[in-house]
């Protein structure tokens, strides 16, 4: 389907969704679907809920945020369950300004943009449909037409509560255009759009001396004031401020705390009473979610100013910290790179992971337990299993600091350094070492890093390098061991025979001489030590292997090289330890013999086919690991 056909199809769909009728027709719609009359907060909550909620380990995960926000599950759960959900149920939190507070590039703006774009799409669905009085610049709720003294009767009949009063303009239109006949008032379906300023508004502070309150509440229309003769005639007023246009939806208040105080006082009345003052009119009702964002420094100075006390209680603060999981940070970088023009550059496996490790280390706070260092903490936070620790330890660590993740290196800095590496090297391939080098060089140019932080960050780069060294060795180890797969299987079978004899207190028979002999303790320990099985734990480990073999046998399956992850790792490490010399020779010899060359080519092919390297990065990895082993 070409683009013009898609445009035509979209236009047809838009026409199909349009609806216009009288207030009487609208009442029939809400009788069938009361969701249509929901509040702004309820609409936002239902939009998030309708995208899907999954429960993982007792935590709620919202599909709505999945595409753009990574590693913020706990913050998002808190935001939805402590603000949107109770606000949708008409509880008192809906009378608060939602203030997202967090470090730069932490996802605050992305979160707000997602809510805005989400609402635009949601109002195109049946559940998110919004109807308004036709011709109203504030797209007012048609239910405001019902007089206050009849609203209790309406609630008993429809089960819908009505809040707010008809705006001055619509009061006049009702009398002049419809002769006071509410049932004849024209109602239309509207679709939220930030571009068309329908249901979504954005207010950004500028110079306090030149910025006018009219930006928020609208202004006198000088082109019609001569015609209507009075400033208090609503027809001589332009209801085009952000608060007017964001009615029924949401308004983003950018850098709210930088705003002049006179702008903030309007928000007090709007959040608490659901109305605001504009021109020479009665209070104007508005139903909108107000979202603001700021950083921690500005928030602290705002709180310390006694003049702002009345606003403090009208604000609900939601911290949006940096992500603290390596795997999720990696996804952030992948997304940012995919959106750029360098998406075709080959980035060697683990490059983004190593950059993510550095970022996360800068954001973590030193654990209070002496037996856990930052690298272990980083692994545990990422869901890796670290021997001797469990999920309870992770939860305890998370409770140690309330502000963990509110400082550290931001994702944009890392992406800038990766971009710089790609552009400077002008190559088709970059690896972890290139990026670590670039991160190190960039620290001097980072404006907000103190000399003390710089020292810490250099240590974190070294820590990330050590982690990469281990990853690189393992990667080459796997590729080499595959080439010696038969040796691995033989070693495995040999180990299992010995374990079986050990556990059953039997002897083994020598295949050549036929003599009986004791299980080979030296062989078993040389394998078990590779994965840290202590002398005291060896019996339990061997028995567990035997139980696993029996369980497989009962199901008619064969226990093989891939059946036990830790044992496979131990076999690989043992074999690699035995093969180290081969790796050293094949990677460091200037002129390898034919046999060695064949082996190197096999390993390179394996790295390319199964591990995601290209020819350049695979050869660089081999050389690097060879140099590590030669140290």
Swiss-Prot record:
Major localisation: other
Modified residues (Phosphoserine): 219
Phosphothreonine modification, residue list: 217
GO MF: protein kinase activity
Record's catalysed reaction(s): Hydrolysis of proteins in presence of ATP
Post-translational modification (record): Phosphorylated by PrkC on two sites, Thr-217 and Ser-219, with the threonine being the major site of modification.
Top EC class, one word: hydrolase
EC number: 3.4.21.53
Consequence of changing residue 217 to E: Lack of phosphorylation. Is still able to bind ATP. Strongly reduces sporulation rate
Keywords associated with the record: ATP-binding, Hydrolase, Nucleotide-binding, Phosphoprotein, Protease, Sporulation
Similarity remark: Belongs to the PrkA family.
Full protein name: ATP-dependent protease PrkA
Native source species: Bacillus subtilis (strain 168)
UniProt lineage: Bacteria, Bacillati, Bacillota, Bacilli, Bacillales
């Amino acid at each position: 389907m070409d683009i013009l056909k898609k445009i035509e199809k979209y236009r047809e769909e838009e026409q199909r969704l349009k609806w216009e009728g009288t207030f009487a027709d609208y009442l029939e719609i809400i009788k069938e679907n009361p969701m249509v009359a929901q509040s702004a907060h309820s609409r936002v909550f239902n939009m998030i809920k309708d995208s899907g909620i999954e429960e993982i380990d007792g935590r709620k995960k919202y599909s709505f945020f999945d595409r753009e926000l990574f590693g913020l599950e706990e913050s998002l759960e808190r935001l939805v369950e402590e603000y949107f959900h109770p606000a949708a149920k008409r509880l008192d939190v809906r009378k608060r300004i939602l203030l997202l507070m967090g470090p730069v590039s932490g996802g605050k703006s992305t979160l707000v943009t997602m809510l805005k774009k989400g609402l635009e799409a949601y109002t195109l669905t049946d559940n998110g449909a919004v109807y308004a009085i036709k011709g109203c610049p504030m797209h007012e709720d048609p239910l405001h037409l019902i007089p206050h003294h009849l609203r209790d009767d309406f609630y008993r009949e429809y089960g819908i509560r009505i809040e707010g009063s008809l705006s001055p303009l619509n009061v006049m239109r009702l009398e002049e255009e419809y002769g006071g006949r509410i049932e004849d008032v024209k109602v239309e379906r509207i679709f939220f759009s930030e571009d068309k300023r329908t249901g979504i508004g954005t207010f950004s502070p500028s110079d306090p001396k030149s910025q006018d309150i009219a930006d928020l509440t609208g202004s006198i229309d000088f082109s019609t004031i001569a015609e209507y003769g009075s400033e208090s005639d609503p027809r001589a007023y332009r209801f085009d401020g952000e608060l007017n246009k964001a009615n029924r939806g949401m308004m983003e208040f950018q850098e709210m705390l930088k705003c002049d105080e006179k702008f903030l006082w309007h928000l007090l009345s709007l959040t608490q009473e659901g109305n605001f003052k504009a021109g020479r009119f009665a209070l104007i009702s508005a139903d909108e979610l107000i979202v603001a964002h700021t950083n921690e420094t500005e928030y602290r100075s705002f709180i310390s100013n006694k003049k702002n006390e009345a606003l403090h209680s009208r604000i609900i603060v939601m911290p949006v910290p940096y992500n603290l999981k390596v795997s999720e940070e990696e996804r952030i970088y992948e997304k940012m790179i995919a959106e750029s023009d360098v998406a075709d550059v080959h980035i060697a496996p683990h490059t983004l992971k190593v950059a993510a490790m550095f970022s996360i280390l800068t954001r973590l706070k030193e654990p209070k337990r002496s037996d856990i260092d930052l690298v272990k903490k980083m692994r545990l936070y990422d869901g890796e299993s670290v021997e001797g620790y469990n999920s309870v330890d992770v939860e305890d660590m998370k409770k140690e600091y309330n502000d963990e993740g509110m400082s550290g290196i931001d994702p944009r800095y890392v992406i800038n350094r990766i971009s710089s590496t790609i552009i400077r090297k002008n190559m088709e391939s970059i690896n972890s070492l290139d990026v670590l080098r670039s991160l190190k060089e960039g620290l001097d140019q980072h404006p907000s890093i103190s000399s003390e932080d710089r020292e810490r960050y250099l240590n974190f780069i070294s820590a990330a390098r050590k982690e990469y060294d281990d990853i690189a060795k393992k990667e080459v180890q796997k590729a080499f061991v595959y080439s010696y797969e038969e040796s691995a299987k033989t070693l495995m079978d040999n180990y299992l025979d010995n374990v079986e004899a050990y556990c059953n207190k039997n002897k083994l028979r020598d295949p050549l001489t036929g003599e009986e002999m004791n299980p080979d303790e030296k062989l078993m320990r040389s394998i078990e030590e590779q994965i840290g099985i202590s002398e005291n734990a060896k019996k339990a480990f061997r028995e567990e292997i035997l139980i696993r073999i029996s369980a497989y046998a009962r199901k008619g399956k064969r226990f093989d090289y891939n059946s036990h992850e830790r044992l496979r790792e131990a076999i690989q490490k043992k074999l690699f330890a035995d093969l180290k010399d081969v790796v050293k020779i094949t990677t460091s010899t200037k002129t390898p013999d034919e046999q060695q060359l064949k082996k190197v080519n096999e390993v390179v092919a394996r790295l390319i086919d199964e591990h995601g390297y290209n020819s350049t990065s695979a050869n660089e990895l081999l050389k690097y690991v060879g140099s590590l082993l030669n140290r």
